[in-house]
């Protein structure tokens, strides 16, 4: 917050690769207003070790800053990516993905976000430092899930549930209420804890179970990666400058992939 951007051509933040996607999403949303390039970079291996891409990522960031082509926050790891769409690296080849990117049909990894859109001035929303005292419970869906295993504590401000790609989940109570997401949602709401469901698509017919999940009181987060949704919730519930609902309703820095 204390950086006078008029004094610099750009900023390079070196970061560990394990949590690169998470920090990238958070900084992209918080520093959405940056009028100079902020590149977040990492390395797959220690600098100097054979096969390390760290020096390439660093020199690429320096070169792009000198070009003056980009304005705003970006992640640079072998390619330039929107920070709010970076998917954590796989555990096999340490390669990061881009949420919503269709390699066959997308000319750019920015997926529908033009350079003109990126260059437009953006309103500064967050002015104060944020202390992350409130927690968000992050649950990823899988078969035979028992929601009785999840007990939000007093520091839990919200729950994020990341479902299958069709956004479906078990709502059947015949085998027991603890297996139904709808019952878990109701249990959380009685404790004044809201449950958010990420990855839903706008203007797409939904399955009956998805309708039940929303009817139970959950809040949808549309076409946003689980990583970006999680960090957005952490930011929304811990900042004190605007209502949570207003933060969650804004597309802060292209985290929502919008289809034409």
Describe every region a protein language model picked out.
Residues 1-260:
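Active-site histidine-anchored catalytic micro-motif
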């Amino acid at each position: 917050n204390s950086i006078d951007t008029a004094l610099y051509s750009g900023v390079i933040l070196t970061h560990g690769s394990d949590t690169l996607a998470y920090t990238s999403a958070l900084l992209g949303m918080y520093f959405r207003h940056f009028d100079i390039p902020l590149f977040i970079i990492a390395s797959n291996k220690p600098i100097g070790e054979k096969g390390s891409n760290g020096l390439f990522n660093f020199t690429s960031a320096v070169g792009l800053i000198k070009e003056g082509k980009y304005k705003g926050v970006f992640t640079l790891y072998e390619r330039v990516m929107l920070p709010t769409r970076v998917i954590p690296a796989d555990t096999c080849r340490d390669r990061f993905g881009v949420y919503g990117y269709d390699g066959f049909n997308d000319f750019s990894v920015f997926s529908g976000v033009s350079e003109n859109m990126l260059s437009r001035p953006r309103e500064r929303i967050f002015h104060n430092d944020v202390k992350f005292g409130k927690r968000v419970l992050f649950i990823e869906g899988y078969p035979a899930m028992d929601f009785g295993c999840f007990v939000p504590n007093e520091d839990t401000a919200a729950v994020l549930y990341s479902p299958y790609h069709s956004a479906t989940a078990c709502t059947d109570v015949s085998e027991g209420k603890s297996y139904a997401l709808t019952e878990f949602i109701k249990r959380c709401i009685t404790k004044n804890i809201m449950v958010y469901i990420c990855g839903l698509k706008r203007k797409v017919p939904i399955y009956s179970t998805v309708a039940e999940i929303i009817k139970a009181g959950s809040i949808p987060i549309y076409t946003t990666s689980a990583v970006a949704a999680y960090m957005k919730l952490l930011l929304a519930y811990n900042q004190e400058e605007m209502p949570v609902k207003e933060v969650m309703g804004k597309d802060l820095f292209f985290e929502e992939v919008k289809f034409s």
